């Protein structure tokens, strides 16, 4: 029998038919919806006189446009000041009500970012195909699922048929062996991977993360690395199923129960790549070589270790790369050879679908405890990824740690990850952000984004500039997974 990768197995489990043009029709187990990419899809159903093929395969929640201050949230839909944002959230409510789709509405205790809500509800399960009109759907691959983003027209197709036409990708394995040093996290792993292979390195591939350092990560840590697979060019990111996967899923609202649970676990336990499976490309990193990472430019691949210096375009022989460095330096307001630790900051954002889970908040709080946000920092935001994460953090007293340190404690949502809600950067402002993209204008017109782990973001907040979180000593305990 031919050895198979995890991706091969998941593909074969869901392939309905192969078409003459080489594409396949695959079955979709779970469809997650939010307010931005679903309105046109629902309208398409109405115009065609169709209903969703499997209503219970869909769940929805608003996240991109929702305000995150308590006052605005208490005001309901009318508190959303931007007319387009308000209309999108309202339209999602109406569409889900009309078609009978389960939605965690803006002020539901279970509301949150789609890629946080799906896993914590158990709506994401091992072996599933999971799609959403959002590129960071790769997050769900942490559960041994085949998960990726889709476009608005495809959202309509999945609603109508529960299937999708797509082509099989190649297999890419990223192996990270060894033990992560103190203060180095899952976010640092994935930033280091992107720095190594570039933002096009995974193009056309399904990316499986493997190795002892990956197996040592918590499920939250695995979600972080799978989340940013798309920044490495891979539409799909995944980690094989193990006992941590199964333990995380057990008992969650959507998880199987009783005999169904036993049968599911038996199947899930097979969702690993066979020892002799062929990968088209293999990339290897040693965990011990990875240091806390900071992005300096306008692409996630423009990333360096905390003890390094911004590149000098004069030393770059390739004219295209040299021009790219020059443009990034100009936009970011940095100088060639500037030390990363000399980059001063205006704002700090801890949140997003990459790093807003309970372990992320614990890691940031461990650094913030007993310290104060630097006087030069205009704003330091902590935005939980869901209402359930927020409630757990408050039960653990993390909100008090952040508030005492001078951070703002917010309601769940995408927040400052992207400029689609009131949380934005001003032009020229530098932000230490735990999000996933640092493109020009991503967090606001003219805003300058630096991607870091939650611990590094908290360390920057209390210092006013980037510092090596490892130099803060024992306060960084427990920061390895985030």
From Swiss-Prot:
Identify which cofactors the protein needs according to its UniProt entry: [4Fe-4S] cluster
Q: What is the reaction catalyzed? A: (2R,3S)-3-isopropylmalate = (2S)-2-isopropylmalate
Q: Does the keyword Lyase apply?
A: yes
Single GO MF annotation: 3-isopropylmalate dehydratase activity
What does the entry list as the binding residues for [4Fe-4S] cluster?
Answer: 353, 414, 417
* Metabolic or biological pathway: Amino-acid biosynthesis; L-leucine biosynthesis; L-leucine from 3-methyl-2-oxobutanoate: step 2/4
- State how it assembles: Heterodimer of LeuC and LeuD.
Q: What is this protein called?
A: 3-isopropylmalate dehydratase large subunit
Give the species. Answer: Xanthomonas oryzae pv. oryzae (strain KACC10331 / KXO85)
State the gene name recorded for this protein.
leuC
């Amino acid at each position: 029998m031919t050895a198979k990768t995890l991706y091969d197995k998941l593909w074969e489990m869901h392939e309905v038919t192969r078409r003459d043009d080489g594409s396949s029709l695959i079955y979709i187990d779970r469809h997650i919806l939010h307010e931005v990419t679903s309105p046109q899809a629902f309208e398409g159903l109405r115009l065609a006189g169709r209903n969703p093929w499997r209503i219970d395969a869909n769940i929805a929640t608003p996240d991109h446009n929702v305000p995150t201050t308590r006052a605005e949230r208490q005001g309901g839909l009318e508190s959303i000041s931007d007319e387009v944002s308000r209309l999108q959230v309202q339209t999602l409510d109406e569409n889900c009500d009309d078609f009978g789709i389960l939605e965690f509405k803006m002020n539901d205790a279970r509301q949150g970012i789609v890629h946080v809500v799906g896993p914590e509800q158990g709506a994401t399960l091992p072996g599933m195909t999971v799609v959403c009109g959002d590129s960071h759907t790769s997050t769900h691959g942490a559960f041994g699922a085949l998960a990726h983003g889709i476009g608005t027209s495809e959202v309509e197709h999945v609603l109508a048929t529960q299937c999708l036409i797509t082509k099989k990708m190649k297999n890419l394995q990223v192996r990270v062996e060894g033990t992560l040093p103190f203060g180095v996290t899952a976010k640092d792993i994935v930033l280091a991977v992107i720095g190594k292979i570039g933002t096009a390195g995974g193009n056309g591939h399904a990316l499986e993360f493997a190795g002892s350092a990956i197996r040592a990560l918590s499920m939250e840590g695995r979600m972080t690395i799978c989340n940013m697979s798309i920044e490495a060019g891979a539409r799909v990111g995944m980690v094989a199923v193990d006992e941590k996967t199964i333990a995380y899923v057990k008992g969650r609202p959507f998880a199987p129960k009783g005999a169904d649970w036993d049968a599911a676990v038996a199947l899930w336990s097979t969702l690993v790549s066979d020892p002799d499976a062929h990968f088209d490309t293999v990339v290897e990193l040693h965990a011990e070589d990875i240091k806390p990472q900071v992005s300096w430019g306008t692409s996630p691949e423009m990333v360096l270790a905390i003890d390094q210096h911004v590149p000098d375009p004069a030393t770059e022989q390739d004219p295209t790369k040299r021009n790219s460095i020059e443009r990034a330096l100009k936009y970011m307001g940095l100088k060639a050879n500037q030390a990363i630790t000399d980059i001063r900051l205006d704002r700090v954002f801890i949140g997003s679908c990459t790093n807003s889970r309970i372990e992320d908040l614990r890691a940031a709080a461990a650094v913030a405890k007993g310290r104060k946000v630097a006087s030069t920092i205009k704003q330091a935001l902590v935005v939980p990824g869901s209402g359930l994460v927020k409630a757990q953090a408050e039960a653990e007293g993390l909100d008090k740690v952040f508030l005492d340190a001078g951070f703002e404690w917010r309601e769940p949502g995408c927040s400052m990850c992207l400029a689609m809600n009131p949380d934005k950067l001003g032009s020229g402002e530098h932000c230490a952000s735990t999000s996933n993209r640092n493109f020009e204008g991503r967090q606001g017109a003219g805003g300058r984004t630096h991607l870091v782990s939650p611990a590094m973001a908290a360390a920057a907040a209390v210092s006013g500039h980037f510092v090596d979180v490892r130099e803060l000593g024992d306060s960084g305990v427990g920061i390895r997974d985030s």
